[in-house]
C-alpha cells in the first residue's frame, strides 16, 4: 500500500479558516478538510470546491473537502480551530469568552472522538484562554495542544521594522512574549536585522512606536476594514505552524504553550519562544529577562488570568 498524504482539518470555514485551508493545500502540506456548522454546510462545500478548482492553475495536488460532518475529519494529523464568534458591538468580553468556550468544548469532543492522536492548534480569541479550554477538554498532553498568536504578532513586528529600515522582511527577526493583545511583550533585545541588533539601527522613540503599533496591530486592521478582522496574516501564521509540525522542522517559533514553572508561571497558557516539530511542542525556550521585561510579562499573565476566571 502506498504512503498516504498527511491530513489537516480546519474547524471554522470563515475567512481565516478558509484561507488556512487554501494555503495548506497550495503548499501541498496535506489533504484538507474544512468544517463548519450544518447551517453553513453548502457554503463550506462551495469554498472547498472553489479551492480545488484553483489547483490545476496553481499546480498543487491536494484533496480539499468541505463538510459539517466530523466523521470526515477522522484520522487527522493536525486539527486547526478557528471556529468561534467575533466580539460584536455591545458584547462584553465575558460574553465572548463564555460563548467561545462552549464552542471550543463541543468542537474538542468531536476532535478527540475522531482524531485521538492529532495535534491541535487553536486560533480562536481570546486565544490564551481558549487554548487552555481545549487542553482541559481534550485530555491531551500539553505538547499536542498549542495556540497561535506569537507568529502573527512577530510577523507584524517584523513587517513594521522592515518598513522602517527599508529592508527585506526576510532579514528581520523578532520575538513577542506574553498574551495576545495590548499586554504582549515584544522583546526588542532579541530582535535583529541581518544579525545586527535593532537597537543599534532604530532610534528608541521609533522602536517604541513600532512596539506600540504591533500591540495594536489587530485593532488597526479592524478599524480599516470597518467590518471583520485580519485573516491573511493569521492564516499564513497558522500555516507556518502546520508546516513546522508536518515536516518536523523543529522551528523556533513563538507559540502559546502550557507553562509548568517556566518564566515563573504555571497552570496557564502563554506566548513564549518554543521549538515546534513533529510532536507539536518540542521544547519551551527560557530566555533571560530584564526586571522590566519580567514586570511586563507578569502584567500580561494577569490579563490572561482575568479572562480565564470567566471559564467554567
UniProtKB/Swiss-Prot annotation:
<keyword id="KW-0597">Phosphoprotein</keyword>
<protein>
    <recommendedName>
        <fullName>Malate dehydrogenase</fullName>
        <ecNumber>1.1.1.37</ecNumber>
    </recommendedName>
</protein>
<keyword id="KW-0560">Oxidoreductase</keyword>
<feature type="active site" description="Proton acceptor">
    <location>
        <position position="180"/>
    </location>
</feature>
<dbReference type="Pfam" id="PF02866">
    <property type="entry name" value="Ldh_1_C"/>
</dbReference>
<dbReference type="Pfam" id="PF00056">
    <property type="entry name" value="Ldh_1_N"/>
</dbReference>
<dbReference type="GO" id="GO:0006089">
    <property type="term" value="P:lactate metabolic process"/>
</dbReference>
<feature type="modified residue" description="Phosphoserine">
    <location>
        <position position="149"/>
    </location>
</feature>
<dbReference type="InterPro" id="IPR036291">
    <property type="entry name" value="NAD(P)-bd_dom_sf"/>
</dbReference>
<dbReference type="GO" id="GO:0006099">
    <property type="term" value="P:tricarboxylic acid cycle"/>
</dbReference>
<comment type="similarity">
    <text>Belongs to the LDH/MDH superfamily. MDH type 3 family.</text>
</comment>
<feature type="binding site">
    <location>
        <position position="100"/>
    </location>
    <ligand>
        <name>NAD(+)</name>
    </ligand>
</feature>
<feature type="binding site">
    <location>
        <position position="125"/>
    </location>
    <ligand>
        <name>substrate</name>
    </ligand>
</feature>
<feature type="binding site">
    <location>
        <begin position="12"/>
        <end position="17"/>
    </location>
    <ligand>
        <name>NAD(+)</name>
    </ligand>
</feature>
<feature type="binding site">
    <location>
        <position position="156"/>
    </location>
    <ligand>
        <name>substrate</name>
    </ligand>
</feature>
<feature type="binding site">
    <location>
        <begin position="123"/>
        <end position="125"/>
    </location>
    <ligand>
        <name>NAD(+)</name>
    </ligand>
</feature>
<dbReference type="InterPro" id="IPR001557">
    <property type="entry name" value="L-lactate/malate_DH"/>
</dbReference>
<dbReference type="InterPro" id="IPR001236">
    <property type="entry name" value="Lactate/malate_DH_N"/>
</dbReference>
<dbReference type="GO" id="GO:0030060">
    <property type="term" value="F:L-malate dehydrogenase (NAD+) activity"/>
</dbReference>
<dbReference type="InterPro" id="IPR015955">
    <property type="entry name" value="Lactate_DH/Glyco_Ohase_4_C"/>
</dbReference>
<dbReference type="InterPro" id="IPR011275">
    <property type="entry name" value="Malate_DH_type3"/>
</dbReference>
<feature type="binding site">
    <location>
        <position position="87"/>
    </location>
    <ligand>
        <name>substrate</name>
    </ligand>
</feature>
<dbReference type="GO" id="GO:0004459">
    <property type="term" value="F:L-lactate dehydrogenase activity"/>
</dbReference>
<feature type="binding site">
    <location>
        <position position="36"/>
    </location>
    <ligand>
        <name>NAD(+)</name>
    </ligand>
</feature>
<feature type="binding site">
    <location>
        <position position="93"/>
    </location>
    <ligand>
        <name>substrate</name>
    </ligand>
</feature>
<keyword id="KW-0520">NAD</keyword>
<dbReference type="InterPro" id="IPR022383">
    <property type="entry name" value="Lactate/malate_DH_C"/>
</dbReference>
<keyword id="KW-0816">Tricarboxylic acid cycle</keyword>
<comment type="function">
    <text>Catalyzes the reversible oxidation of malate to oxaloacetate.</text>
</comment>
